[in-house]
Amino acid sequence: MAKAKFERSKPHVNIGTIGHVDHGKTTLTAAITTVLAKAGGAEARGYDQIDAAPEERERGITISTAHVEYETETRHYAHVDCPGHADYVKNMITGAAQMDGGILVVSAADGPMPQTREHILLSRQVGVPYIVVFLNKCDMVDDEELLELVEMEVRDLLSEYGFPGDDIPVIKGSALKALQGEADWEAKIIELMTEVDAYIPTPERETDKPFLMPIEDVFSITGRGTVATGRVERGIVKVGDVVEIIGLAEENASTTVTGVEMFRKLLDQAQAGDNIGALLRGVAREDIQRGQVLAKTGSVKAHAKFKAEVFVLSKEEGGRHTPFFANYRPQFYFRTTDVTGIIQLPEGTEMVMPGDNIEMTIELIAPIAIEEGTKFSIREGGRTVGYGVVATIVE
């Protein structure tokens, strides 16, 4: 059969399955593709095809992830499923698989388990904004009251981590039975996708967000002024816009963009993804440097102290061979530059072993433009020893 031309008319959403090992994440992923395939919205993928997720070398870390895509009547989805718990931790912290929403799979037969809690916490920390619950293996539970109990438990757990537990859709189903083609259970998969369509909003496009460009290089053009180059991370910048220069300085400086150049051509505007040079009015060459960002006035601030969720590379992944302790002072690489920072470990944690993931407080020696969700890597003498994501700004 000829491959159907891919319709890009539908809005695109990135989602993934999360939850405890053996609660049925991969079976559910297979069931979604199989049920939607009947309506022509997907290519059916068997459990084995998804479970044999290729290992990806993402920036030197090995992550196994399965990517599938499918469509409902209103949307196009890219869906990630990770076989192992460590893969989720790495994926979510490095942002290798960005999620606009998650389907939390909980076995009705077992109820919430340790990784259920961990994945909810991780989702909260790395900023997965919406969660829909699929209560799986309901064919194995005859007792209606027991199902209601498990549902209440899951809702309470979600509320505990700051998700709206009372409002989150919970669908009771059986991924395996749906995969085997039993109509009643297939209907539950359709119900799940209807809830996902309705409950997880279409993400704001990068171009609709406030302008931000990390500065990679700076040079001066005689008679014209100072040019900052970099790749626009989000938003749109137009000639004549007033922007701020943020980070690595006591206070933000304000300037007007008097020219935008790309591939040696002058443009009226540039947008997310473009590599540009921005000509800045009244800025001396020494007042601006790599590692700062240009951003829409008031949209982002420079901070030096924050809490972060961090994944420390194992020895096998090229990380440290020995643990580190509180007051460890590595470099934190944000966007285009390294800044030294001091690590404080949580109460009761003496040390961090290679391969661990942990929440820590970091204080940089100079402020950097950061927000919740900003990704960074931790480096020591030029080599990466960990990855992190800003969970909360302290000051």
Curated annotation (Swiss-Prot):
InterPro entries: EF-Tu_GTP-bd, EF-Tu_GTPase, EFTu-like_2, EFTU_2, G_TR_CS, P-loop_NTPase, Small_GTP-bd, T_Tr_GTP-bd_dom. Residues 10-204 form the tr-type G domain. Residues 19-26 are annotated as: G1. It is found in: Cytoplasm. One of its GO terms (molecular function) is GTP binding. Residues 174-176 are annotated as: G5. PROSITE patterns: G_TR_1, G_TR_2. The keyword Cell division does not apply. Its EC number is 3.6.5.3. GTP binds at residues 19-26, 81-85, 136-139. Mg(2+) binds at T26. Residues 136-139 are annotated as: G4. It catalyses: GTP + H2O = GDP + phosphate + H(+). It comes from the Bacteria. It is an enzyme of class 3 (hydrolase). Belongs to the TRAFAC class translation factor GTPase superfamily. Classic translation factor GTPase family. EF-Tu/EF-1A subfamily. Monomer. GTP hydrolase that promotes the GTP-dependent binding of aminoacyl-tRNA to the A-site of ribosomes during protein biosynthesis. This is Elongation factor Tu. It comes from Bacillus cereus (strain G9842). The gene is tuf.
